[in-house]
């Protein structure tokens, strides 16, 4: 990989423990740059960066800058952060996370994956395809890729695959040769204001590709399909289950471990159609078949053969917190999933049904008051595949509470719309007892949310085991 053209000194990341920030910091460190950072609290990303040799301070203080010559911030960092204030006072350049990512992307041919849902998994699948094709890509993802144990991969090849964050409009800065749009549902309207403004930004995201690049669009999603006539000057490849898709899935067979499917590949320019597959994807849900189709579309356009595509999918180990099994006890399976938008929640619960669950118990921690308020109706109708819904308090993520937008409002909204079994979670400490009283062998307990619920999902199997066999639990305590 080429380096940035000038010596830029020590790079300081404010909020280095964030998933996006940590990935960029790790790649810069692997490129040989001096990298350091700070965050408000310890987390797994901070520990991983320290293990890689990057100094991370806990807490924000002007003294943390040290000899830094560049400061990188994310949208979560306020302008009055003491490190940012000190950097500006010392005339140190303050760079947004997306700007730094864009500079890294200029050093490679880049694939940028955007969309409301499925970005992280699709980014990981495309990375797996390029890696299987021995293109040795660099990867910066928005989630932990199980095969890497991190959200980054430093490759020596010409290609880079990145997840593009649309939440603050920063994805418009990213210079890519290939763009992917998985879907487009109303989200982050606190930034965009209207769905129309968000859609216009996606149009620009795709329009930024050069004439020799191409866009990969999910035609199954109506808002994405509506983009096609507006982007007629660009090369477009569509994918999905629709008969109109250029890369179309057929004969999808699902089981408890994943899906098998065939693909019809249509080349509109040459008026040719061929069949490919079957492909085996060790992931549950039709939404993940769609994600795989996006990776196939990229692979086909890059002349990667079908055998390589099959190999990439067969060995795919998934992404952390995407339908991740944290344990099984007494025949009850506990799942941890990042899903926090109604569309994601519905897809995950449907996947649990497809996996053969006797019944599905959803434990939902709404993420942000503003999201719950904006999408309240959708939240109240997205959980029909769960036999029982346990609703936790809203994870604020730094937001102030909004009157009337809370756990109890969601519980009432679900009940009013006909859900027969919805209960509030009084406190996380009561979760295991509640699940123990409800769950039966063969059930899936699906913990959903982008906040602290992941910690509950990790602890729940052990807590259930202790409740199922209290004598063994007491014996273990005595031995300790």
Curated annotation (Swiss-Prot):
The keyword Nucleotide-binding applies. Its EC number is 6.3.2.8. One of its GO terms (molecular function) is ATP binding. ATP binds at residues 115-121. Pathway: Cell wall biogenesis; peptidoglycan biosynthesis. It is an enzyme of class 6 (ligase). It is found in: Cytoplasm. Keywords: ATP-binding, Cell cycle, Cell division, Cell shape, Cell wall biogenesis/degradation, Cytoplasm, Ligase, Nucleotide-binding, Peptidoglycan synthesis. SUPFAM superfamilies: MurCD N-terminal domain (SSF51984), MurD-like peptide ligases, catalytic domain (SSF53623), MurD-like peptide ligases, peptide-binding domain (SSF53244). It catalyses: UDP-N-acetyl-alpha-D-muramate + L-alanine + ATP = UDP-N-acetyl-alpha-D-muramoyl-L-alanine + ADP + phosphate + H(+). One of its GO terms (cellular component) is cytoplasm. One of its GO terms (biological process) is cell wall organization. InterPro entries: Mur-like_cat_sf (IPR036565), Mur_ligase_C (IPR004101), Mur_ligase_C_dom_sf (IPR036615), Mur_ligase_cen (IPR013221), Mur_ligase_N (IPR000713), MurCDEF_pg_biosynth (IPR050061), UDP-N-AcMur_Ala_ligase_MurC (IPR005758). Belongs to the MurCDEF family. NCBIfam families: murC. Cell wall formation. This is UDP-N-acetylmuramate--L-alanine ligase. The gene is murC.
């Amino acid at each position: 990989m080429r380096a940035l053209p000038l010596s830029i000194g020590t790079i300081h990341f404010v909020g280095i423990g964030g998933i996006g920030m940590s990935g960029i910091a790790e790649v810069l460190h692997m490129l040989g740059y001096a990298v350091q950072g700070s965050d408000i609290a310890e987390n797994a990303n901070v520990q991983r960066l320290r293990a890689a040799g990057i100094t991370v301070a806990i807490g924000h203080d002007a003294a943390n800058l040290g000899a830094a010559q560049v400061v990188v911030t994310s949208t979560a960092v306020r302008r009055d952060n003491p490190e940012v204030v000190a950097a500006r006072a010392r005339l140190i350049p303050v760079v947004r996370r997306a700007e730094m990512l864009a500079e890294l992307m200029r050093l490679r041919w880049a694939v940028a994956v955007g969309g409301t849902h499925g970005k992280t998994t699709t980014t990981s699948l495309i990375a797996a395809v390029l890696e299987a094709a021995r293109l040795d890509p660099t990867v910066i993802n928005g989630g932990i890729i199980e095969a890497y144990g991190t959200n980054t991969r430093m490759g020596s090849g010409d290609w880079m695959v990145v997840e593009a964050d649309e939440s603050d409009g920063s994805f418009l800065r990213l210079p890519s040769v290939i763009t992917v749009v998985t879907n487009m549902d109303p989200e982050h309207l606190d930034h965009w204001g209207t769905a129309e403004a968000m859609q216009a930004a996606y149009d620009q995201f795709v329009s930024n590709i050069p004439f020799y690049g191409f866009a990969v669009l999910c035609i199954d999603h109506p808002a994405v399909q509506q983009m096609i006539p507006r982007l007629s000057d660009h090369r477009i490849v569509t994918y999905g289950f629709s008969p109109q898709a250029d890369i179309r899935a057929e004969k999808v067979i699902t089981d408890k471990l994943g899906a098998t499917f065939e693909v019809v590949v249509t080349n509109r320019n040459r008026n040719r159609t061929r069949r490919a597959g079957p492909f085996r994807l060790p992931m549950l849900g039709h939404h993940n078949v769609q994600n795989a189709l996006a990776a196939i579309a990229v692979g086909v356009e890059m002349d990667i053969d079908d055998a390589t595509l099959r190999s990439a999918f067969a060995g795919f180990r998934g992404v952390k917190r995407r339908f991740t099994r944290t344990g099984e006890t007494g025949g009850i399976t506990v799942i941890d999933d990042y899903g926090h938008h109604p569309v994601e929640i519905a897809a995950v619960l449907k996947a649990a049904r497809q996996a053969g669950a006797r019944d599905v118990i959803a434990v939902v921690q709404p993420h942000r008051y503003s999201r719950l308020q904006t999408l309240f109706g959708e939240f109240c109708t997205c959980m029909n595949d769960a036999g029982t819904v346990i609703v936790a308090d809203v994870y604020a993520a730094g937001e102030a509470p909004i009157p009337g937008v809370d756990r109890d409002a969601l519980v009432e909204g679900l009940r009013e719309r006909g859900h027969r079994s919805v209960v509030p979670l009084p406190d996380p400490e009561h979760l295991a007892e509640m699940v123990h009283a409800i769950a039966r062998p063969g059930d899936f307990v699906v913990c959903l949310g982008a906040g602290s619920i992941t910690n509950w999902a990790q602890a729940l199997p052990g807590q259930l085991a202790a409740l199922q066999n209290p004598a063994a639990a007491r014996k273990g305590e005595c031995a300790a």
